[in-house]
Amino acid sequence: MATKKAGGSTRNGRDSEAKRLGVKRFGGESVLAGSIIVRQRGTKFHAGNNVGMGRDHTLFATADGKVKFEVKGEKSRKYVVIVTE
């Protein structure tokens, strides 16, 4: 005979896989064209000069240079810019 009463089932116990979002290259870092700078959901950061945006809002360098983060405009938007040497 069992000495332990049967436990009930649960509807919890699931979680989604981490998506590894965030800034990948920080201000002042040198990057090559095509390097991913920010992985994000939506436009937390906007694309500035020499920066492109992928269809999942990933920001990437379109030219070699140094990464710079700027806050511009009436709405104080955060822009990522590549400063070429």
Swiss-Prot record:
Coiled coil: none annotated. Keywords: Ribonucleoprotein, Ribosomal protein. Pfam families: Ribosomal_L27. Residues 1-20 are annotated as: Disordered. GO terms for biological process: translation. The keyword Ribonucleoprotein applies. GO terms for cellular component: cytosolic large ribosomal subunit. The keyword Transport does not apply. InterPro entries: Ribosomal_bL27 (IPR001684), Ribosomal_bL27_CS (IPR018261). Belongs to the bacterial ribosomal protein bL27 family. PANTHER family: LARGE RIBOSOMAL SUBUNIT PROTEIN BL27M, RIBOSOMAL PROTEIN L27. HAMAP family: Ribosomal_bL27. This is Large ribosomal subunit protein bL27. It comes from Haemophilus influenzae (strain ATCC 51907 / DSM 11121 / KW20 / Rd). The gene is rpmA.
